[in-house]
Amino acid sequence: MTCLAWNTTPTLTDLCRAIEQHTAPLYLIVCLPENHIPDFSLSNQPSELEGRLNNRLVQAIKCLQFNNVNVLENLLPDVHLWLVPPHRTDRLHEHFPHIEWQTKAIPQSTPTPLKPWFRRPEHQAAPEHVLIIGAGIAGAATARKLAEHGVRVTVLEAGKTAQAGSGNRQGLLYAKISPHNTEQTELLLTGYGYTRRLLEDLLPDSDAWGDDGVLHVNFDDSERKRNQALGLQHQHKHLYRSVSAEEAAHIAGIDVFSDGLYWPQGVWLNPPAVVHALLNHPLIELHEHSPLTAVSHNGTQWTAHTPNAHFNASHIVYCMGAHSPTAADTNVSALPFRQIRGQTGVVSASPFSQKLRCAISGESYISPSWQCSHCYGATFVLNSNDETWYPHEEADNRAALHQLNPPLAQSLFSDGLQTPPLQSTQGHAALRCDSLDHLPVVGALGDIAAMQSAYAKLALDKNYRLDNITCPYLPNAYINTAHGTRGLATAPICAAAIAAEILGLPHPISQRLRTALHPNRAIIRAIIRQQPLLSV
């Protein structure tokens, strides 16, 4: 692994020369001089390699964000480009173990010491075979990322692939962000571009996604205030911009009766198609209808038991979504999760609704027609574990659609929104998993009972110095879950983060985010509050 860095934007000729002179895997790190999309200028007589690289870059840089690093994977086979905004160029040590500067080096900041429970596990073994528990978007993306690096993966799914939170007919890739640089905003912006580029590579010619953008209408004063603040962030005007009601109508193809915020690279997509495409790899073995009933570690490997078989592997990653609270390992199930019930509807397109060119989102959403049908919704019921489809929630979704766009709803339903009959609608009901602080749970799994013992003094003083006590992690065990309603934007980048942890690769997210997402945050918080997650 070679990591080359420039303190300004190099020419394509410079990049191609570096590619030709070094052996893959190769990481090309460009420290951007300003918060603008860089211009990688072509030479007067570009080489074949320069032309190929330019063609890949034209599409890949459309979704750059300037909150954190941008990871552009496999622009050429095993050649990865990282674009770093100016305020992050002194923190490359958070991502790369070593760097070879091709220009004058940018001085690096001193790393901030980490609490022991946020440090990486010591003495990590190289993966021989990895078990992934769960075949939704998080499990599929994690499996794919490991397989692309030559690791054999077995995926165990309790039911059928992409039938829970990843089972909607049409979902939206978007980033409903704050105008402030919160951890969630950083994650959503980083993940948004990452998933957008993933779609281009994974399903370049598929009709299972559409790239006409997502329009967020200002449905109340709070939403208008948030979107207007975002619209003033000119460094991201290529990602999102404020639009008037007239421009919004022109973009959507129908009147939307409101101004809003337009994401031109936003997409609707069919989540099951994405999940199946991710799992389509020769090193991935999928077992459906294989619920995990027990798990054990014998000192060298994990054994996962299902009703009909058992599976051995060196590593295990839990990507169980809404099933996380019932995981066979209490080090997963004891973590504090919230289940959120959601239901969507599907209706045949009308002549009027077929004019809709982009997805519209407000308090509810509707996608453009795909295969002559629209998907719309969704309900949001906290702390529910009921996956039954209900007519009364279908009525709620129709009413919400009518509030979002009355002419559109009236063209799709008649008789006071009662036709077609509520019971006949083909929709989807499923549970989503969320954490108490609304951030995903991603990283190495701690041994909860051992941590409660090792760090018990935090219950008396949350600032007690315990820096010399190594965190008792479970051996080679990880988690990627609790993506809530934002999994399309967050799960793939978190899958890349898990792969980086397991394989020792450059890390695609900042240390700030790794700390914010770490599963140990909940364990330590519970100890400090004298509310231990496990009774010992």
Where are the language model's segments positioned?
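Helical element adjacent to the flavin cofactor pocket in flavoenzyme catalytic cores
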Residues: L261-P307, F311-H315, C319-T326
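Glycine-rich FAD pyrophosphate-binding loop
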Residues: E148-G167
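C-terminal catalytic lobe of FAD-dependent flavoproteins
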Residues: S414-V536
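Flavin-dependent oxidoreductases
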Residues: A141, E186, P307-A399, P407-Q426
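Dinucleotide-binding Rossmann-like beta1-alpha1 core, especially the glycine-rich loop
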Residues: G171-I251, Q423
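Beta1/beta-strand and adjacent pyrophosphate-binding region of the FAD-binding site
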Residues: L4, E122-A138, T154
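Helix-loop-beta segment of a Rossmann-like dinucleotide-binding subdomain
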Residues: P179-H180, D205-H216, S242-N280, T379-L382, ...
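The AdoMet/dcAdoMet-binding core of the Class I SAM-like
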Residues: T2-S109
